[in-house]
Amino acid sequence: MTQVKKEDIHVIIINCSSSYNLEKTLLTLKSLEGRIEDITILDEDHINLQINNYSLNKFIQRLKLIEEDIGTTLNNHIQKIECDYILFLNNNAFFTSNIIQKMLLLNDNHQLLTYKNLIKGEIIESPLLIRTSFLKNNKFFKKYQIPFKEALFSSWLSRIDKKVIKNVDREFVKHSPMGKSQFTSQKNEFISKYQNEAKSYESMPSISIMISNYNMEKYVEVAVNSCFLQTQLPQNIFVIDDGSTDNSYENLTNWIVYPEFKLLNTENIGKAKALNKVLECIDTDFVLELDADDWLDPNALEVIRGYLKSLSQSVALLYGNLRLWKQAGIQDVRYAGIRKGKPIFDKNELISYFFPLGPRIYRTSALKSINGFPVIEFKNGRMYEDVSIINKLIKGYQLSYRDFTVYNVREHNLSITKKNHSDWSDFLKYLD
């Protein structure tokens, strides 16, 4: 039986919405006073948290965010912590009177303690107590690797072996209301999918993912990471950097340690030509095209494979609905609705489609049978390559719309389609 030690816990308080709620959180720590070595409060610039007449003031230190990046800030801070455990209190969390010291212990088989919390209708599992040594070797994702900051803990938990996790059933952690919280129901619904169990896909159709990147260093790692944080992994993830002038390619090289990840680079040749280079490498049954600034739901491939297994051989493209988010700051997005797809059968219906058709899951053999993405004269194939390829496929194959939503579209100022919307009418003149 693990014995209680003195001063073996470092407390980290994150995302506290007011001074009142901070005081409430701190007061409930008094029952742990003998075990607390330090208390770190993560200061976010938009909140001025005050602490008045609190007996544990001697333990408290403030920590400023590094470049608005919670993951990086925590990773750096944790490397300096020497005590056995780190206790996370996030989103106005506090202990109830039911807390007992022996519940905040881990035996030799467990590395972390979690609890389940009901947030706006979704049950979210959250880390509570983690061995410091384990955290030093299992770092949190950086801000440009997760879609929004609220996904930090759930995305981290999703890659941890369930065998080392102890979940506490008793309700001894609660949360004060967040007020105008950034936790929308849509974000919580997304986050809850990180908790889905991994599923076998040995007998399912094989699928690769291809991403063409140009100067999307702020977003492309979110796209890549979303391919790995899946309940069913893809066979391969191909990323081609199309001559970026930012730090995209350098950042992408960090992912080559994963065997499924394949990184290519080229001078700036445009998206159609870049994707054709990737297509030469693909040998799976299907390939999903993921834009470098978009991302997938954690169960996306599980859902998609479910449709692919019964897809007619005459179908060259499977697509569904799109979930739209608007960029609102460095690490925040706001839900902007669902773009519901519809069946299309000919060129006229294709060009009258009000938004990009997606997600686009191509039958690889069909793509190769028409020699890949057309490089038309308009902009040398650098725009509307999705419409060009679908227009070519629809002449000899069927398209299949199914009502599913697993693909997240990011609207932001760097979006090429948004910037060049007026070119659409000119593009149509080149479409045969």
Predicted regions and their residues:
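Glycine-rich, basic loop-to-helix element that forms the pyrophosphate-binding segment
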Residues: 66-80, 266-282
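Catalytic beta-strand/loop signature of glycosyltransferases that borders the donor
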Residues: 164-172, 321, 400-406
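Short aromatic/hydrophobic "clamp" motif used to bind/position activated sugar donors
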Residues: 86, 287
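Acidic donor-binding segment of Leloir-type glycosyltransferases
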Residues: 29-65, 224-264
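Acidic donor-binding loop at a coil-to-helix junction in glycosyltransferase catalytic cores
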Residues: 145-153, 379-389
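Conserved donor NDP-sugar-binding/catalytic core segment of glycosyltransferases
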Residues: 93-121, 301-332
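N-proximal low-complexity "stem/linker" segments adjacent to membrane-targeting elements
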Residues: 1-28, 173-226
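A recurrent flexible, glycine/aromatic-enriched loop bordering the glycosyltransferase active site
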Residues: 112-130, 343-361
